[in-house]
Amino acid sequence: MEYRLIGDNDYNFDPLATILKNRGIEDPKLFVNVDQSSVIHYSKLNNIDKAADCLIRHLNNKNKLFVQVDSDVDGYTSSSIIINYIKKICPKANIHYRIQDGKEHGIFIDTIPDDVDLVIIPDAGSSQFEEHEALNKRGTEIIVIDHHECERVSEHAIVVNNQLSPNYSNKTLTGAGMAYKFCQAIDEKLNKNEAEQFLDLVSIGNIADSADSRNLETRYFMNEGLKKIKHPLLKKLFKKQEFSTKGDKSIQNTQFFINPLINAAIRVGSSEEKDQMMRAFLLSKEKVPYKKRGQSETELVSIHEDTVRILGNLKAKQKRIVDAAGVEIKNRIEEKSLTANKVLIVYIEGILDKSLTGLVANQLAEEYKKPVLLARNDPEKGKDILSGSIRGYDKGFIKDFKKELIDTGLFEFVEGHPNAAGFAIKRQNLILVNKVLNEKFKDINIEEDIQNVDFEIPAKRLRKEFILQLDGYKDYWGYKVEEPLIAITDLEIEVEQIEHLGKKNKTTVKFKHGDIEYIRFKSDENYFNQLTASNGTLVINVIGKAKANEYKGKKTPQIEIYELEVVRTKQKELVF
């Protein structure tokens, strides 16, 4: 167990400021008290007035509109914001949408009806230059509302993209945020105030797409949206997950317990299930048939209630599929000794559905502590073309995996975020990529797993008040503002005081030191036996997170153990 203390280890006077400064936040006070003054006016986005005027003109002319829904949570929320907004300002608008079959992104010309006058592409489409030109030639206009990096501005589409807007300083805002800005621009032109009611969707989309929660504008939208959950589907999702979230609508709880349900439907749901979810996002008031298990008769329930039930089932289905595929992929990794490479490159043809590639790649990156590339055949792109997903390992040496791959010059494309992207490559070039990366990083320990800890505290000096204080800051945590880790040293515990708990299977290790409980999940029988093999007193070091276990109104301070090492064992001291 290795760790590195970052910051000044101030756990007495202002621990929150210590944590925030460790995350690169220069003004903790401003961060904690973020307000509307951090919002950047939409007019700083290039082409936004042009896009707003274009949509208004098409609505006035009663033209046919087509929205392509992108295949992730940010895509569904950004499309929902735009479609719901259009229905608000123009209830009779002739608007249609299309959901992707799988995890595709952007538009496909043959799926857009010939009589469409305006195509709107939220959360995608900036770099689809050929498609823009083809649609233009048949007389169709295109509005792109996007946030992804792109090399240039399209000549044949109206592109509103914060990455392509030099005067718009917030590059972290995602598709849902950009959709909201678009609606704001239309509001001002029409003297309306409809965009504000969709802030809950703005928040969900930004959190799901791992927007940098250090950015003040982005954080403001996240916070405001979670304070104002009005959307019926979102309200029921938070209600369903109340046990896990303890009723706390925080950024971290949303990322862990709400967005994975929506994502599961996008990844493993049938076309009918995805369509029902989209109708729920679009505020449908319909009733749908539902038959309870063990009953012969069906009843009609609200679409939002039924959709939440379906999402729960799909999340469980996704877990079963991912677990089974994960075993097969890990077997391949071991059989072919792939961990010897600097980057984990795995050919997964026939093992895993395309829609789950990114999810599994992310899990493998966390487990193997190195960047991961999962590849499969892609006959649609060419006979000898492989495509798939990459995921970086944020805590490792390589901070921008996408750039490293692009710099090899061997890929057809690598598109997406620095540590989460899709790619295409010629089969023979993938072998060369592996050689290039192995050579480039031959003297670097890519898997170096040194945990950055915010505080290092001897066990004898750790106070329950400090643990409860840190737990009270949980609403601040999010992407790039990670929950703090604490290194607790020289903790002495009698072996017989260590418990192994669980209802069906014992998987939790627990012990108490002073007023503080220590708990480690996913601890099987083998782990417990190894930990308790010695007699006497264990002297251990622990890396963990501060938690508070609340029961019947009483809060018990806990350390959720991330890593544990036994430093030494000593004999029991005589008590007389």
UniProtKB/Swiss-Prot annotation:
Record's keyword annotation contains Transferase: no
EC number: 3.1.-.-
SUPFAM superfamilies per the UniProt record, alphabetical: DHH phosphoesterases
InterPro entries, alphabetized: DDH_dom (IPR001667), DHH_sf (IPR038763), RecJ (IPR004610), RecJ_OB (IPR041122), SSDNA_exonuclease_RecJ (IPR051673)
UniProt entry keywords in alphabetical sequence: Exonuclease, Hydrolase, Nuclease, Phosphoprotein
Enzymatic class: hydrolase
Entry GO MF terms: single-stranded DNA 5'-3' DNA exonuclease activity
Phosphotyrosine: residues bearing it: 473
Protein origin, superkingdom: Bacteria
Listed GO biological process terms: DNA recombination; DNA repair
Keyword Ligase in annotation: no
UniProt family annotation: Belongs to the RecJ family.
Function: Putative single-stranded-DNA-specific exonuclease.
PANTHER family referenced in this protein's UniProt entry, alphabetically: SINGLE-STRANDED-DNA-SPECIFIC EXONUCLEASE RECJ (PTHR30255:SF2)
Name this polypeptide is given: Putative SPbeta prophage-derived single-strand DNA-specific exonuclease YorK
Organism from which the protein derives: Bacillus subtilis (strain 168)
Gene designation: yorK
